[in-house]
Amino acid sequence: MQSRETRIGFRTIEFFPQDGVYLNGTKLVVKGVNRHSFSVDGGRATSAAMSRQDALLVKEMNMNAVRSHYPPDEHFLDMCDSLGIVYMDELAGWQNGYDSKVGPKLVKEMIERDVNHPSIIIWSNGNEGGWNYNLDPLFAKYDKLQKRHMVHPWADFNDLDTHHYPTYLTGVARFTNGYKVFMPTEFMHAMYDQGGGAGLRDFWDRWCTNPMFAGGFIWVFCDEAPKRSDKGGILDSDKSNAPDGVVGPRREKEGSYYAIRAQWSPIQLKPLLITDHFDGSFLVTNEYTYTNLDKCRMTYKIRTCETPLKNAMESGKVIAEGHVQLPAIAPGETGKARFTLPASFREGDVLELEAFDKEGKSICNWTYPIRLAKQYFDHKMAQTPMTLEAVQPATATQTATSIELKSDRVTVTFDPATGMISRIISGGTEVPFKDGPVAVGMKMRYEPTLSYVRNSNEGAVYCAKYKGAADSIVWRLTDKGLLYMDAILLNRASGGGGFDDAFMDSKVFNLGLTFSYPEKNCSGMKWMGRGPYRVWKNRIPGTNYGVWHKEYNNTITGESFENLVYPEFKGYHANMYWATLESDTTPFTIYSRNDGIFFHVFTPEEPKGRVKDTMPKFPEGDISFLLDIPAICSFKPIEQQGPNSQPGNIRIKSGDEGLHLNLMFDFRQ
């Protein structure tokens, strides 16, 4: 006698037109991802261990749903049943439907195999036109007891609009402007470094304004690049056809992995700024489906982040920690969390909060600077021992061919015709940081007749004056060899000298100053700011404040499969406090003295297999200090994305103090 054991579960699943999907009587919003069955070595052949790994990664991203283009391995459905992940089970049909001879057999086999999996909440007939209408009645026929809802993915069909890759304002009489339940079964296409978590919150927040929003599925879980034995064992994603994942082919975590995890965390924190008035309380929102927040817990840690000028205490050291009292609030409610500020709170540099679910698993962590960049700089400089005392005061000299600021250890030379750095010598070694400042996203013209040098008690000074977007850039070299830069930008409505008001881009993607520095000289970077992943304007969530380090790499997201090192080295880094560019010959450190600076470190290479460029344009220089950066997107252009993806615009009124870009450079060897 043959027998088979099958584990089943009991739950109710209901669909109500113009209302939503209800699981056990509670309205469900799916936070989902599309997943292909894939392994590097086995292609479409996977294992129970891989299914477990993938399901756990889905849960770690705070997702609760999965869809694919065909019935998955049963062991993956078993994992979904076990972990509480809901599933949209689809009859294969990628844009071409089965005929009426083969199709009925496949519908019957799929439903009879999968019917007892409680994770399955919706059936799907084909994909993007790949359905046969004659098969539709068969889903209810074979799912005779539960009669789960059936959809045509990408279509507005059967009272559920599943439109693929909607724009932010989709659409006329549909989605947020319509009167049908909507659930995009593909959106935020994560090709290369695009999509995924970039811009996710804009779309999600907009859709959540409509009670008929039932969730959606990001495309796609992992890059599909099988090992090609016929091509020497390379991993091949077929150029741009399959590098679509938020994780790599071996499940390497990309930046979007963490961005999604943060934006879909079931516990959300309202915007928080640590000031002198902070008393340890802040607002939290419960975005769980069922769980009251009193079943969860949260901890806090106070960390120190020292500068390279002071090594008295290891960066990242925890000087205080404890528990946060969470409010007893039901799903959908907002309440106040609180903790008692430890006596050492103001001695720290970063507040870290971490939330744990009812099973004790970490669901998200958030970080907040206890001091903003200028406060941090002043505080740390006041505590820094007075090392490397100067023998002679710094001097400023000007000739017809050069402007020179010179101290005992560092000499900085400027071109008097352009106002740009032409040479830096430190300890007898040339530091190849030069050819700047060059304006990014704006126009400025150096005015040599208005510029001047002077010697002061605070060091050697060179004041470079400009027409256009910049008013002045003051360089000051201290006796100890520290180089200060104070730039005043956009403080006048008319740039003068023929510029009038046409001295900035009408759409601001990048705005700031850039310099050149040879990439070959750089071996790594250590910095304080958001990290460890690079950011885009619409993908800052998922990065945290701290001191980070990464060695140089040339990873091309979704393509460098033979040497896939994450986080990527090149790109934009948010909220820089300080950064050390490591080099065997010419390391140096930059300190930010104002807030919100994006640090552009070299320009990532475009994927060779791309159909078109995948990233917005970077500044022309190698190293940039920016007050605004561009967003990234896929499929739809930027103007069809959400508000946090849009380029900035500049308005200047008489009396504005302008924008400041204040830095300090330590070139001392």
Question: Model-derived features: where do they sit?
Answer:
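N-terminal carbohydrate-binding accessory modules
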Residues: M1-V58, D78
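Terminal connector regions
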Residues: Q2-R4, S315, P342-A382
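Extracellular interdomain linker/stem segments of modular secreted and single-pass surface proteins
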Residues: F10-P17, L372-Y376, K520
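Substrate-binding/catalytic cleft of secreted carbohydrate-active enzymes
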Residues: A49-A259
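Substrate-binding clefts and catalytic carboxylate motifs of secreted carbohydrate-active enzymes
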Residues: W123, A173-F339, F345, F588-S624
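Extracellular/periplasmic ectodomains of large secreted or surface enzymes and adhesion receptors
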Residues: S237-D238, D244, R250-R251, G255-A259, ...
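Exposed beta-strand and adjacent loop surfaces of beta-rich binding modules
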Residues: D279, K295-T299, V350, I421, ...
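Beta-strand/loop-rich accessory regions of lumenal/periplasmic or secreted enzymes
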Residues: S344-R346, Q375-Q669
